[in-house]
Regions:
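Membrane-proximal transmembrane or re-entrant/amphipathic helices at the cytosolic face
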Residues: 150-151, 175-241
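Short alpha-helical transmembrane segments in multi-pass integral membrane proteins
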Residues: 20, 26-41, 118-147, 163
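C-terminal transmembrane helix end/exit motif
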Residues: 129-180, 208-221
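Helix-loop junctions and terminal segments of transmembrane helices
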Residues: 1-15, 21, 85
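Interfacial segments at transmembrane-helix termini and the short loops linking adjacent helices
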Residues: 40-74, 148, 185-190
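Membrane-interface helix-loop junctions in multi-pass transport and translocation proteins
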Residues: 95, 104-137, 178-204
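Membrane-interface junctions at transmembrane-helix termini in multi-pass inner-membrane proteins
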Residues: 73-103, 113-114, 118
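Hydrophobic residues within alpha-helical transmembrane segments
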Residues: 30, 70-73, 99-107, 130, ...
């Protein structure tokens, strides 16, 4: 995004720069929001399959999964900040992001200390997520205040649609987990030969549900995806030439 924004701004193409920023935020939301919901719903089976063996017990899996859920909540804001920060760098403003980072560091440290006592390791993870939203708020406010960029009503609608699709996907995955629990009683007692296919099935079910919902709500447009892929292909061909 940084070289694209720099090119548009140097050429005086303000609207093109705004459009590129909108697309970056939209694609960031399209990737991060569904991933957040999936990580929250599938945290327990993911940790159980990857790590529960040897001295890593079932209780350790549960505790780790809780931390993963707490971290996952902040994933969209992490991604959005990465999409918004280049807007400052493209204008030669490197001081503002540093100031924002200092504020976030202080907020993260303060919240970690405050939440660690009542909630333990989950409190520390939650503090990191909350601090990421503080960072996102700073960037949104700073960009709007300087007139660099502000999200449009259309972008807001798309993000709401993505959130809706993600929640439906999460609900379907959760129902699938309930079905597995009803059928097999206890996930922790299953062998890996059964767990892995069931987990893969839940993932496929989630992806299929999101794609169907995204198509119905107009979130995914095949022509836009093809244009993006073709433009990347042309750029790669030019670099190789």
């Amino acid at each position: 995004l940084l070289p694209i924004l720099s090119h548009h701004l140097k050429a005086g193409e303000i609207e093109a720069a705004r459009h590129s920023q909108n697309k970056a935020v939209e694609y960031g939301a399209l990737l991060s929001i569904p991933a957040t919901v999936a990580l929250i719903v599938l945290a327990y089976p993911i940790i159980d399959i990857l790590f529960r063996h040897g001295r890593f017990t079932a209780e350790d899996s549960v505790m780790t999964a809780r931390a993963v859920i707490a971290y996952s909540v902040g994933l969209p804001s992490y991604v959005m900040v990465k999409a918004l920060a280049p807007n400052f760098f493209a204008r030669g403003d490197t001081k503002t992001p540093v100031k924002y980072s200092i504020v976030v560091m202080i907020a993260n440290l303060s919240l970690s200390i405050a939440l660690m006592i009542p909630f333990g390791h989950v409190g520390v993870a939650s503090a990191t997520s909350v601090a990421s939203f503080v960072s996102l708020y700073q960037y949104l406010r700073g960009l709007k205040k300087r007139g660099y960029w502000s999200y449009s009503a259309e972008l807001n609608r798309k993000i709401l649609k993505i959130t809706l699709c993600s929640l439906v996907m999460g609900g379907v995955i959760y129902l699938g987990e309930l079905g597995i629990t009803w059928k097999f009683d206890n996930w922790l007692l299953l062998s890996y030969g059964i767990k892995i296919p069931l987990f893969a099935g839940l993932c496929i079910l989630g992806v299929a549900t999101f794609c169907v919902m995204a198509k119905l709500t107009g979130v995914l447009c095949l022509t836009d995806i093809l244009k993006m892929l073709s433009s990347r292909g042309k750029k790669n061909a030019q670099k190789q030439a």
